[in-house]
């Protein structure tokens, strides 16, 4: 500090006053908080109780989600694993079962595709899983499915034994087993379709435009490696084709999401 003629002091060039420091700190803190207009608004998640909002509903049918007891007793108690064709080939042969029956990875791929989609983030998507053994599962749109298959397997084992998975923070139910049939959980006005390679080919965008203003659409997608397309015949109104080529379940889910997004203006 240097002394002036009137007895006051003047800060040096490299020194800052305490008030300057406080003002800079305050401005820094303010700038770290985004304006309200920049904070994304999380849409309200759809539930089966909402019977009127137009939406896309995807039912992953014949999903291969089955647990197997690896050992019993011991200090850790019973241990279960999600049956899959990579880790349990010998076991499947011993049981006389086709390896293709144990493909839970297909359900995993479909869930990642669906829950990552813009239509889900916009609050216009509902997802259900119907296992090959007839267990019906409701998927909360806000659930974060594990990216790795190993962690996904552990989550599914926990779900199938506890019947529900809750968020650790808010205690919100993220996954739960619900009562059949699926039609009890669909909107009042809902067109139900399933996909078939032998059905008439339709462009998803064109098909969605034929819906009434408040009519939802429910698509049954086979979440299995191979099999007949009659898994939803008791529920559906019609069958449609999406491509001249065989599609994986994940790609079929993606095409329907994109089609609805285009028609409903979701970007």
Swiss-Prot record:
Stabilizes Arg-103, annotated site positions: 105
Annotated region described as Disordered, given as residue ranges: 1-46
UniProt-annotated site: Interaction with substrate rRNA, residues: 103, 144, 147, 151
Keywords on record: Methyltransferase, Nucleus, Ribosome biogenesis, RNA-binding, rRNA processing, rRNA-binding, S-adenosyl-L-methionine, Transferase
Cell compartments where the protein resides: Nucleus, Nucleolus
EC class: transferase
GO cellular component, one term: small-subunit processome
Reaction catalysed by this enzyme: a pseudouridine in rRNA + S-adenosyl-L-methionine = an N(1)-methylpseudouridine in rRNA + S-adenosyl-L-homocysteine + H(+)
Record GO terms (molecular function): rRNA (pseudouridine) methyltransferase activity; rRNA binding
Residues engaged in binding S-adenosyl-L-methionine: 195, 222, 227-229, 242-247
Start-end of Low complexity biased regions: 16-32
InterPro entries given in the database record: Alpha/beta_knot_MTases, Rbsml_bgen_MeTrfase_EMG1/NEP1, tRNA_m1G_MTases_N
EC number: 2.1.1.-
GO process annotations (BP): ribosome biogenesis; rRNA base methylation
Biological role: S-adenosyl-L-methionine-dependent pseudouridine N(1)-methyltransferase that methylates the pseudouridine corresponding to position 1189 (Psi1189) in S.cerevisiae 18S rRNA. Involved the biosynthesis of the hypermodified N1-methyl-N3-(3-amino-3-carboxypropyl) pseudouridine (m1acp3-Psi) conserved in eukaryotic 18S rRNA. Also has an essential role in 40S ribosomal subunit biogenesis independent on its methyltransferase activity, facilitating the incorporation of ribosomal protein S19 during the formation of pre-ribosomes.
Family per record: Belongs to the class IV-like SAM-binding methyltransferase superfamily. RNA methyltransferase NEP1 family.
Assembly notes: Homodimer.
Official protein name in the record: Ribosomal RNA small subunit methyltransferase NEP1
Gene label: NEP1
